[in-house]
Structures are given as structure tokens and as C-alpha cells.
């Protein structure tokens, strides 16, 4: 139900009196405004359990991928952040949210208008007239309806910005993962080619021994089978490399097969990326606030509270001051003006009806948003704890695999010397070569897993997600304490 004053065309004193009454009512209702927003809090521990006794120390490491020490990867990430369509789409969503915020009405509004008309009848000259209208409205907002509406719109801007950060982080993770896997695939291909050369040498040696009646036909057949086995795997290794190169091109915003346009040589078999971060790393748990998904969940809780504020405000009367001024000009210099000014009171619906149900629904959404925020935080803590454990485990495994390769290489050298002195069989030599080949494959796998766990750890922390911040505290190092 709405009760509004008629258009006032009385002396200005009466309009001023009504305005004073409206102002008094507004001031009387102003005490009902809600308090300031309190963000949700989580009892973060000083650090993660997987970090042990390491002292948490922050490092400026927003570009954490640079710590893999590979300039090609750095260039690929830069290409992806400039050319990937997902970033463009996310930035467009920010623009949409900002436009929606700008379109949200304010407490004070002006609505100008103008018109020109030409009227006449048969046998008479047309009469031209012009009008200029100016409307004015001022909403007294003691219950914060308009304020809550703008807060919700502003919160959606922050959500869109955090979603852009999430898209940026996902893109960096995908590019780093694809690059680590590419170098691993190239390393595996190189190892298979080296093993193929070794098996050919062994086969030639076996045939020489067979001619000297120092080897059997069975040993030749086994050597040929081992060579055929490794040759069968080579096409799969090469296909895996091409697939990763195509993935990298698409992540950089280009069609598959156009990776050469990026200005980097991905066919060159560079070494596998090796992170320069100690496995004994200390990380403060509240660093998780950097994660875009946590920021999104917190802002959605903020929006839910703002929506609840709007629903609550709808239960109470809305008082506004409205006014219009209309000026009409006729041909011949004649003109006239009309104006109106006064309060308008909009009463709420009957309590206990749809408006109250809307409040109940909004309150339930606040509870839901808070629960989602808490669940997001708990999930983030779990992910970082497991990422820390995985990084520590893969670092230890990679170090052990280096030792294994060194020892198996020494064993192969000794076996060759003993074999040359006829104190070892051909089978012993083949076994020693196979053991070294397996150890080198394991080392390549461990290095790839360590590189991937480094990527996972930083992305689980939300590192590198803020594209506009020059320095984001992310990676950490141990200090003696």
C-alpha cells in the first residue's frame, strides 16, 4: 500500500514544512541502521603440521614459477597471461560487475527530460512548444535498503576480481604442469634412445661372441627382443611430446601446432625443471587468505548479509522526498512553469507474508554462505598439508634417485671391466645395463613429480593469483630459530 502526497502547487512554506516533517521521521528511524560488517574468522594455527619445527618466514614470491630456473617457462607463462581467452572472459565479467554497480541507484537521483512538439488543426497554423522536465528524489534510508543493495553490487565486483585471480592461477598451474610434463617426456625419450643405442651395442657384441662360439643363439634372440621392445615404445614417447606442445600452444592462446610462433624452442631437449625451494619449508597457515576460492567464499558471505539487509529493510516503511520542475515554452515568447515537492511514504506489506518469508530465506542463505566459507577454508588447509607432505616426500625420493643412478653407473663400469676380463657373463652385463636404465627412468620420474609437487604447493597457497600485485608473500624458506 502506498500513500503519497498530491502534487503541491501551494506556497513554498508549506512544502518546506512537509520536508521538515519528512526529515524528522528519517532522523527518528536512523537509529535502526545495522552495524559494520564483521568478516568471518577462522582459528588458524601458527603453521602447518607438515612443516614440523620450521620457522614460518614469508618471501616475496608472486612469480613462483621463476624459481624453477627455466627462462622458457617464464616466457610461456607471460604469453599465456596475455593471450589466453579465459583471462579475457574473466576480465569481461569484472567489467559487467562494475557496470551493474554503477547502475545501482543512489539515495539521491536526478531524472532530466526534454521534449519538442508541433500541434495544429486544419486551417490554423501549427503551434510549436518545448518542455524541460527535471525530477528529483531523495530516499531516506534508515534501514539501509539502498546501502545494502550497493554493498551487494560492490561485493559482486570483488567476487569477479577474485574469479579472475582464480582463472589466472589455474592457467599458470596448467602451463607449468604441461611444461614440466613436456620436459619429462623429452627426458624419457632421450633415455629410451640411449637405451636403444646400448642394446644395439650389446646385440652386436652378442653376435660377435656367437661367431666365436662364446654365446648361444638364445642370447642373441633375447638381445633382439630387448631391442625390439624399446623401439616399440619410441612412437608413443614422441606422440606424448607433441601432445604436450599442442597443449602449451592452446594455453598460450594459439592453435595446436603453432607453438613455434611463441618464440621459444620446445624441441630443444632442455633439462627438467628443478625447484629451488627447501623441502623443510615453514608456512604460516593464515597465508591461505591469498587463495582466490577463500576470497570468493568470504565475499559471497558478505553479499548474502547485504541481501539479508535488503530483505529486512523491506519490512519497514520507506520515506522519500520527491520533486519535479517542468518548464514549457510556446511560440511567441510565452512560457510557464510547474513544480511539485513533497514526501512520499511507502508502507510495507502485511507482516508475516511473503516479505517475512523472503527474510527467512535470506537468513538461511547467510548460514549456507558461512558454512561454504568454512568448508572452503578447511579444504584449503587439507590441500596445503598434503601438498607439503608430497613436496617433502618427492624431494627425498629425488635425492635418493640421484644416489641410485650414481651407484648403478659405478656398478655398470665395474661389470664391463670384469666382463672384459672374462670374469662376468653377458647376462651380468645386460642386467647391469638394465638396472642403470631403470634407475635413470626412476630419477626422471622423481624429478618430474618433485617439479609438479612444487607447482601444486604454490597453487594450493594461492601464490601468483593476484595479477596486479607486484609482490605477494607466498613461498617461504626455513630459518634457524
Label every model-predicted segment.
Residues 2-10, 16-82, 238-289, 458-481:
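Terminal intrinsically disordered/low-complexity segments used for targeting and assembly
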Residues 34-35, 63, 71-72, 76, ...:
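Small/polar-residue-enriched beta-strand and adjacent coil segments characteristic
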Residues 81-101:
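Mid-chain, structured segments of secreted extracytoplasmic proteins
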Residues 94-96, 101-103, 118, 150-152, ...:
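Heptad-repeat amphipathic alpha-helical coiled-coil interaction surface used
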Residues 146, 162-283, 390, 394, ...:
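Periplasmic alpha-helical coiled-coil/stalk elements that build and connect Gram-negative outer-membrane
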Residues 210-214, 419-423, 460-464:
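A short glycine-centered flexible hinge/capping loop motif at secondary-structure junctions
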Residues 425-437, 467-475:
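Short histidine
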Amino acid at each position: 500500500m502506498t500513500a503519497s502526497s498530491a502534487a503541491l502547487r501551494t506556497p513554498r512554506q508549506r512544502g518546506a514544512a512537509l520536508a521538515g516533517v519528512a526529515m524528522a521521521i528519517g532522523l527518528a528511524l536512523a537509529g535502526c541502521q545495522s552495524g559494520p560488517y564483521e568478516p568471518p574468522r577462522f582459528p588458524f594455527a601458527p603453521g602447518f603440521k607438515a612443516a614440523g619445527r620450521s620457522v614460518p618466514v614469508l618471501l616475496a614470491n608472486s612469480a613462483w614459477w621463476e624459481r624453477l630456473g627455466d627462462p622458457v617457462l617464464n616466457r610461456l607463462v607471460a604469453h599465456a597471461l596475455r593471450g589466453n581467452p579465459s583471462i579475457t572472459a574473466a576480465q569481461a565479467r569484472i567489467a559487467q560487475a562494475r557496470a551493474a554497480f554503477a547502475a545501482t541507484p543512489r539515495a539521491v537521483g536526478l531524472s532530466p527530460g526534454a521534449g519538442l512538439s508541433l500541434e495544429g488543426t486544419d486551417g490554423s497554423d501549427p503551434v510549436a512548444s518545448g518542455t524541460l522536465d527535471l525530477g528529483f528524489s531523495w530516499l531516506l534510508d534508515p534501514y539501509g535498503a539502498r546501502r545494502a543493495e550497493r554493498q551487494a553490487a560492490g561485493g559482486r565486483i570483488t567476487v569477479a576480481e577474485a574469479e579472475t585471480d582464480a582463472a589466472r592461477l589455474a592457467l599458470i598451474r596448467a602451463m607449468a604442469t604441461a611444461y614440466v610434463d613436456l620436459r619429462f617426456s623429452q627426458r624419457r625419450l632421450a633415455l629410451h634412445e640411449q637405451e636403444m643405442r646400448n642394446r644395439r651395442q650389446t646385440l652386436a657384441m652378442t653376435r660377435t661372441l656367437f661367431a666365436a662360439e662364446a654365446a648361444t643363439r638364445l642370447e642373441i634372440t633375447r638381445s633382439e627382443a630387448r631391442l625390439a621392445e624399446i623401439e616399440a615404445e619410441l612412437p608413443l614417447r614422441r606422440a606424448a611430446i607433441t601432445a604436450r606442445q599442442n597443449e602449451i600452444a592452446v594455453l598460450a592462446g594459439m592453435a595446436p601446432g603453432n607453438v613455434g610462433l611463441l618464440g621459444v624452442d620446445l624441441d630443444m631437449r632442455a633439462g627438467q625443471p628443478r625447484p629451488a625451494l627447501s623441502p623443510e619449508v615453514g608456512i604460516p597457515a593464515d597465508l591461505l587468505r591469498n587463495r582466490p576460492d577463500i576470497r570468493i567464499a568470504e565475499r559471497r558471505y558478505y553479499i548474502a548479509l547485504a541481501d539479508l539487509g535488503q530483505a529486512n529493510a523491506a519490512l519497514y516503511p520507506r520515506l522519500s522526498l520527491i520533486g519535479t520542475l517542468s518548464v514549457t515554452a510556446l511560440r511567441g515568447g510565452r512560457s510557464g512553469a510547474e513544480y511539485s515537492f513533497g514526501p512520499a511514504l511507502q508502507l510495507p506489506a502485511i507482516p508475516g507474508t511473503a516479505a517475512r518469508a523472503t527474510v527467512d530465506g535470506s537468513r538461511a542463505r547467510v548460514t549456507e554462505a558461512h558454512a561454504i566459507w568454512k568448508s572452503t577454508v578447511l579444504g584449503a588447509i587439507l590441500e596445503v598439508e598434503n601438498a607439503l607432505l608430497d613436496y617433502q616426500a618427492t624431494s627425498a625420493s629425488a635425492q635418493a634417485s640421484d644416489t641410485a643412478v650414481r651407484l648403478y653407473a659405478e656398478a655398470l663400469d665395474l661389470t664391463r671391466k670384469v666382463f672384459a676380463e672374462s670374469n662376468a657373463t653377458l647376462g651380468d652385463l645386460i642386467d647391469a645395463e638394465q638396472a642403470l636404465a631403470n634407475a635413470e627412468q626412476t630419477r626422471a620420474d622423481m624429478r618430474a613429480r618433485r617439479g609438479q609437487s612444487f607447482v601444486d604447493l604454490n597453487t594450493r597457497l594461492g601464490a601468483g593469483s593476484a595479477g596486479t600485485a607486484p609482490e605477494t608473500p607466498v613461498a617461504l624458506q626455513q630459518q634457524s630459530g
